[in-house]
Each structure stands twice: as structure tokens, then as C-alpha cells.
Regions:
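Terminal-appendage/accessory-domain detector
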Residues: 2-150
Length: 150
């Protein structure tokens, strides 16, 4: 797997050192690419000790190479893009380019994506009922007379 991005992205997150903590994992492109491939998503649960210790993720992360691509560096900091190329054992090659990261100024989350992210981040701490209640209060904040429950 080859991930090409802007220079600062390579310097900040392109280290081949395998993460040992959730914080290190969040700043490791090889880890995040591998975890997304293995688990089919990249959510908060991929940044746990259990996921970091997953041998399938570790093995795949060792095969991720992060490189600078001049056209992404030229667009940075206005655009935070990258492209990924995956070469499969059967010879198939898959590529995908993203001009702007999901959730960025130029590629904002949809309303549904923002709600899903909120639930993913809050449910482990708040539980489903409190999380839904809090999200509803936030979505209707202009109608609240006070914010004590938030």
C-alpha cells in the first residue's frame, strides 16, 4: 500500500514506527490505513489497545509506505489531500485520491455524518439514551432557555 500526501503530513504521520498507544495510533498513517482496511472503518474503537495489538493490523501497517507527492504539497495548507494505491496479491491495483480530508473546510461532514460521529464519540461515555438526548439538545440549542444539562 502506498499513501502519497503533502510533506508535513509525511513528517507528522508517516513514520514507520508502529504505535503503542492510542495517541500514537491517531498520528500514524500506516496504522490508520491498515486499521481501516482490516476493520472496514476508522472510528474511535480502532484507537484502543486491543485494536493496536491486532496482529492483522500490525502486519498490514508494515506494508504501508507514506511518501510525499509534490502536487499535494503545492496545494497545502489550503487542501489536505492524499492518494492511496493498493496492490493486491492477485495483481489488481486500486487507487483513490482525496483532494480534501473528510470533515475539512472544503469537504465538510454531512448532517448525518456529524450525527454519526457524535454518537460514536459520546456513546462509550454517556450511553445511548443520554447521548441521543444531548445530541437533540445541541441540534435545537437555539430553542433552549438555559444550558445546565450540557
Amino acid at each position: 500500500i502506498r499513501d502519497r500526501t503533502y510533506t508535513i503530513g509525511v513528517k507528522q504521520c508517516g513514520t514507520p514506527h508502529y504505535p503503542t498507544t492510542p495517541v500514537e495510533a491517531k498520528f500514524s498513517t500506516p496504522y490508520t490505513v491498515a486499521a481501516a482496511c482490516v476493520h472496514g472503518e476508522l472510528a474511535l474503537k480502532q484507537f484502543t489497545k486491543e485494536s493496536i495489538n491486532d496482529e492483522n493490523v500490525r502486519e498490514l501497517a508494515c506494508r504501508v509506505k507514506v511518501e510525499e507527492a509534490k502536487h499535494f504539497t503545492a496545494r497545502y495548507p489550503d487542501h489536505w489531500g492524499c492518494d492511496v494505491e493498493v496492490k493486491c496479491c492477485d495483481g489488481n491495483v486500486f487507487t483513490h485520491e482525496v483532494t480534501d480530508a473528510s470533515g475539512s473546510v472544503h469537504n465538510p461532514l454531512t448532517h448525518e455524518q456529524a450525527k454519526d460521529k457524535f454518537m460514536d464519540l459520546c456513546m462509550p461515555e454517556m450511553g445511548l439514551k443520554k447521548c441521543k438526548q444531548t445530541m437533540d439538545e445541541i441540534l435545537h440549542i437555539e430553542q433552549l432557555t438555559c444550558l445546565p444539562s450540557l
